[in-house]
């Protein structure tokens, strides 16, 4: 494996000099901040327990503040449903008994509750939707009855499974009507969430978050100031800037535009972050998303150039787990203007754009300089272990993580073992 150069003082100074300040009025937005430190969140996929063989117990919980469990599906009438009942609550792990009395949850639900018990600062959120299952959001959000049904069924899963909040991943509201309905949907979830907390968990604050786009065509349709008021966090999906859908090779998750090579930077994170803040989102509610994977391009002369095909991948064409990178024979290169790494093999002419630990350090310095809320990663199974972990690198760079406690009391869970706190 190639070793990456540590970030120098000069690089940090150059980064700080590059940053432009958002509008002061929005930097100082008057909002209630419940977290007592930075978020270091990661999406955990329920399909990851299969071929990827990544189980809840494999999470390095000491590095993580929020596990976002994905994904739940939803129906057109707003009903939230499990996308995989076996992975979610049926699978028996090695330490699960087949002779338990009562109705009990197993699978990832029980395993994540065990992780919560052992790590009281780690919160688990239920993520609904995602790219594949966003089709029914417009209908689910379109009427008061559907919104109420969505909130009711989402919160039922949250309390039955012993989770600490709800994450909505609607990709993406397509127009002003859908954007307005999204706010109404979030407000309904918040209202029912708070009513549940008042009755069953007095004083506890269940979280409400979304995954949000970094592409202007998508976020320009959103009601940013309203999102900033109703949500605890906005997890900015600051990746997938280039890929098989692109006409030319490009950076997957660059911080800035590169004027000398604009073809390599069709999108950039800094523009999105500034637009969200200037649109009325409190900076400390923006969590900067980072990829734990790389996007590949074949038969290319370099970044911002033509290519022919994306090749294979770890699990799908053109996408490689970070733990498989850099590939043998490739040289890691850095675009110091765009702030983005990529590997290139001059013999095979394959280019892969991905975030290195050094890039994570740069991004954390960036988010801290703007007063953002922390880091988010997609997704847990693709990380390396030990010192090369990007999640761990983010933890070390952030410093003080949020340590607000999770909840272990769910007196009306339908599962006896969750109701009893696995005691």
Curated annotation (Swiss-Prot):
Proregion residues excised on maturation: 23-34
Temperature characteristics of this protein: Optimum temperature is 45-50 degrees Celsius.
Carbohydrate-modified residues: 218
Reported uses of this protein in biotechnology and industry: The antagonistic activity of Trichoderma harzianum is used for the control of several soil borne plant pathogenic fungi.
UniProt keyword Secreted present: yes
Superkingdom of this protein's organism: Eukaryota
UniProt GO MF annotations: chitin binding; endochitinase activity
Reaction catalysed by this enzyme: Random endo-hydrolysis of N-acetyl-beta-D-glucosaminide (1->4)-beta-linkages in chitin and chitodextrins
Keyword set, alphabetical order: Carbohydrate metabolism, Chitin degradation, Chitin-binding, Cleavage on pair of basic residues, Glycoprotein, Glycosidase, Hydrolase, Polysaccharide degradation, Secreted, Signal, Zymogen
Annotated Pfam families: Glyco_hydro_18 (PF00704)
GO cellular component, one term: extracellular region
Subcellular location: Secreted
Protein name according to UniProt: Endochitinase 42
Organism: Trichoderma harzianum
């Amino acid at each position: 494996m190639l070793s990456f150069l540590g970030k120098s003082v000069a690089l940090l100074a150059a980064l700080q000099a590059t940053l432009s300040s958002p509008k002061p009025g929005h930097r100082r937005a008057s909002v209630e901040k419940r977290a007592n430190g930075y978020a270091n969140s990661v999406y955990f996929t329920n399909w990851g327990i299969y071929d990827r063989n990544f189980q809840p117990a494999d999470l390095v919980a000491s590095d993580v503040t929020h596990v976002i469990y994905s994904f739940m599906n939803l129906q057109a009438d707003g009903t939230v449903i499990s996308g995989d009942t076996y992975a979610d609550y049926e699978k028996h792990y090695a330490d699960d008994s087949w002779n338990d009395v009562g109705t009990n949850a197993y699978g990832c639900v029980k395993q994540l509750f065990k992780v919560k018990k052992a790590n009281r600062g780690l919160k688990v959120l239920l993520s609904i939707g995602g790219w594949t299952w966003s089709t029914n959001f417009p209908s689910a959000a379109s009427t008061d009855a559907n919104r109420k049904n969505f909130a009711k069924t989402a919160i039922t899963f949250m309390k039955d499974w012993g989770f600490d909040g709800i994450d909505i991943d609607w990709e993406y509201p397509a127009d002003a009507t859908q954007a307005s309905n999204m706010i109404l949907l979030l407000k309904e979830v918040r209202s029912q969430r708070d009513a549940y907390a008042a009755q069953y968990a007095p004083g506890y604050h269940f979280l409400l978050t979304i995954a949000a786009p970094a592409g202007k065509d998508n976020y320009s349709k959103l009601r940013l100031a309203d999102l900033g008021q109703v949500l605890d966090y906005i997890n900015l999906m600051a990746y997938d800037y280039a890929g098989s859908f692109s006409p030319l090779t490009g950076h997957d998750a660059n911080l800035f535009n590169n004027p000398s090579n604009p073809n390599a930077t069709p999108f950039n994170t800094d523009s999105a972050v500034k637009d969200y803040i200037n649109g009325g989102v409190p900076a400390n509610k923006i969590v900067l998303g980072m990829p734990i994977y790389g996007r590949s391009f074949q038969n290319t002369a370099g970044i911002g150039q033509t290519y022919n095909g994306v090749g294979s991948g770890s699990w799908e064409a053109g996408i490689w787990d970070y733990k498989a990178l850099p590939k043998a024979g490739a040289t890691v290169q850095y675009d110091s203007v765009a702030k983005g790494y990529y590997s290139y093999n001059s013999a095979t002419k394959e280019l892969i754009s991905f975030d290195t630990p050094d890039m994570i350090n740069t991004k954390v310095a960036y988010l801290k300089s703007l007063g953002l809320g922390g880091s988010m990663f997609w997704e847990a199974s693709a990380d390396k272990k030990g010192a090369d972990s990007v999640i761990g690198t983010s933890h070390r760079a952030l410093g003080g993580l949020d340590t607000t406690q999770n909840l272990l009391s769910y007196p009306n869970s339908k599962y006896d073992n969750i109701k009893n706190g696995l005691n």
